[in-house]
């Protein structure tokens, strides 16, 4: 599996141009992308990290990291996915960085999703949806999610970079992913959720034994 993730990471490097500021996601496939990016770090201006973990990895490779607030133009954002379909709709947030990932993805002009073939699905929903929640609202939000048909589980011992908690939600109805994304986000106490149906991936680079293909 690591070989496929490396393939996908290498394919994303082809989209990096000189003097770019690059948004960098979070997760195991992205970690391989950071390794590849380190080889051309002299060509890029800097990176915007979607998590403290990614920022630490970038700095360890000697890659400059800047704050999103200091960026007016972000040409590209590279990140993985827990699930992705052919339309570029995704479930993200297995690593708990979904809120910052969604923010950076929306700032970026182009979102490149890098995955191995196991992450490609016809219908989203087998992987649970991470929902970032203000701690005091955990029980209330969980009850509201049950009303939507979901089965929330508290992610024990995990605190997000924003100081919040995560509910992992199973068995949600993905017949209309965009409506689901909205339905979760309007619950008071919800910060963000891991359904990416509004900000789609512009390119989905899928690595398999036969090579890397763009799903879109």
From Swiss-Prot:
Q: Which InterPro entries match?
A: NagB/RpiA_transferase-like, Ribose5P_isomerase_typA_subgr, Ribose5P_isomerase_type_A
Arranged from A to Z, the UniProt key words for this protein are:
Isomerase
Instruction: Cite a single GO BP annotation.
Output: D-ribose metabolic process
Q: Does the keyword Isomerase apply?
A: yes
Q: Which residues form a coiled coil?
A: none
List the active site.
101 (proton acceptor)
Q: Which GO terms describe its molecular function?
A: ribose-5-phosphate isomerase activity
Any one of the GO CC terms: cytosol
Enzyme Commission code(s) on record: 5.3.1.6
Where does the source fall among the domains of life? Bacteria
Q: Which CDD domains match?
A: RPI_A (cd01398)
Its UniProt entry gives the catalysed reaction(s) as:
aldehydo-D-ribose 5-phosphate = D-ribulose 5-phosphate
The entry's substrate-binding residues are 26-29, 79-82, 92-95, 119
Purpose: Catalyzes the reversible conversion of ribose-5-phosphate to ribulose 5-phosphate.
Annotated family: Belongs to the ribose 5-phosphate isomerase family.
Q: Which PANTHER family match?
A: RIBOSE-5-PHOSPHATE ISOMERASE (PTHR11934:SF0)
Q: What is this protein called?
A: Ribose-5-phosphate isomerase A
Species the sequence originates in = Legionella pneumophila (strain Lens)
């Amino acid at each position: 599996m690591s070989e496929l993730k490396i393939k996908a990471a290498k394919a994303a490097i082809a989209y990096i141009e000189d003097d770019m500021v690059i948004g960098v996601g979070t997760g195991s496939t992205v970690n391989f992308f950071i390794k590849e990016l380190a080889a051309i770090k002299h060509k890029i201006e800097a990176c915007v990290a979607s998590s403290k973990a990614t920022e630490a990895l970038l700095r360890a490779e000697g890659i400059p990291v800047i704050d999103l607030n200091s960026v007016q133009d972000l040409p590209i954002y590279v990140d993985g996915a827990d699930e992705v379909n052919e339309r570029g709709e995704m479930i993200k947030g297995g690593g708990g960085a979904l809120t910052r990932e969604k923010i950076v993805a929306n700032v970026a002009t182009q979102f490149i999703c890098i995955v191995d073939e196991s992450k490609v699905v016809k219908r989203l929903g087998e992987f649970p949806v991470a929902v970032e929640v203000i701690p005091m609202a955990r029980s209330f939000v969980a009850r509201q999610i049950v009303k939507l048909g979901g089965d929330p589980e508290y992610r024990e011992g995990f605190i997000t970079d924003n100081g919040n908690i995560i509910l992992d939600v199973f068995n949600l109805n993905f017949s209309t992913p965009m409506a689901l994304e909205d339905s979760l986000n309007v619950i008071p106490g919800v910060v963000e959720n891991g359904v990416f149906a509004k900000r789609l991936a512009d390119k989905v680079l899928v690595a398999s034994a036969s090579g890397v293909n763009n799903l879109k």
